[in-house]
Swiss-Prot record:
InterPro entries: GGGP/HepGP_synthase_I, GGGP/HepGP_synthase_sf, GGGP_HepGP_synthase. Keywords: Lipid biosynthesis, Lipid metabolism, Magnesium, Metal-binding, Phospholipid biosynthesis, Phospholipid metabolism, Transferase. The keyword Lipid metabolism applies. This is Heptaprenylglyceryl phosphate synthase. Pfam families: PcrB. The keyword Lipid metabolism applies. Gene3D superfamilies: FMN-linked oxidoreductases. It catalyses: sn-glycerol 1-phosphate + all-trans-heptaprenyl diphosphate = 3-heptaprenyl-sn-glycero-1-phosphate + diphosphate. Pathway: Membrane lipid metabolism; glycerophospholipid metabolism. GO terms for biological process: glycerophospholipid biosynthetic process. It comes from Staphylococcus saprophyticus subsp. saprophyticus (strain ATCC 15305 / DSM 20229 / NCIMB 8711 / NCTC 7292 / S-41). Sn-glycerol 1-phosphate binds at residues 12, 159-164, 189, 209-210. One of its GO terms (molecular function) is heptaprenylglyceryl phosphate synthase activity.
């Protein structure tokens, strides 16, 4: 099984967004720990498979973060299933997992499945609107979510998602301080090395996504956080 406990940096690629072969090569040979493929809109079996096959030319772990069952294809090292704990809609807590088990329960290799405890904190992002997430969260709330994930559900990953904006470091640190076993992922708004360095000093693993499509050189510089963390 792929060991993700040592991952400090992940590049997240959206299969619905175009990326040149040259930029993809730079991303995949950058010394990042893994490539995550995932997104919210227009995620299909075809574009997921197309991007996966391109990434698999390089020797690094590749993960699919599942947003719908129709886009799930074989060949990934790990499959991440989000449960959005601050969603007001129960289907985003366990609905995706329920449908996966109903459709593929006897075929799933559970050694390849990672259940992520998601907390979405940017009210304006697509995933917050889609999941009807309650983003009005203070330190006490995030600490309680962290305890829920670490101590009660005992999930391997807590993912704090700001999706497009840079997050509040005090909230990320409040969560980090409560986690003893669960790995803390942070994603959202990292657009330069300094922001990456700050979040890497708090979270176990940082996820860098949008900046790949805006400024590839700034994206590549974020990998340097591995030298100090």
């Amino acid at each position: 099984m792929t060991d993700m406990n040592k991952w400090r940096h992940i590049f997240k690629l959206d299969p619905a967004k175009p990326i040149s072969d040259e930029d993809l090569m730079k991303i995949c040979t950058s010394d990042t720990d893994a490539i995550m493929i995932g997104g919210t809109d227009d995620i299909t079996e075809e574009n997921v498979a197309h991007l996966m096959h391109k990434v698999k030319c390089y020797s690094l772990p590749i993960v699919l973060e599942i947003s719908n069952l129709e886009s799930v294809v074989p060949g990934f090292d790990l499959y991440f299933i989000p449960t959005v704990l601050n969603s007001r809609d129960v289907k985003y807590h366990n609905g995706l997992l329920l449908e996966a088990l109903k459709s593929y329960g006897t075929l799933i290799d559970f050694n390849e499945v990672v259940f992520e405890g998601y907390v979405v904190l940017n009210p304006d992002c697509k995933v917050a609107k889609l999941t009807q997430a309650d983003t009005m969260i203070d330190d006490e709330d995030i600490e309680a979510y962290a305890q829920m994930i670490n101590d009660m559900y005992q999930l391997p990953v807590m993912y704090i998602e700001y999706s497009g904006v840079y997050g509040e470091t005090n909230l990320v640190k409040a969560a980090a301080d409560m986690l003893t076993e669960t790995q803390l992922f942070y994603g959202g708004g990292i657009s330069n090395y300094e922001e990456a360095e700050m979040m890497a000093s708090i979270a176990d693993t940082i996820i860098v996504g949008n900046i790949i499509y805006e400024d590839i050189n700034k994206a590549l510089k974020t990998v340097k956080v591995k030298e100090t963390h």
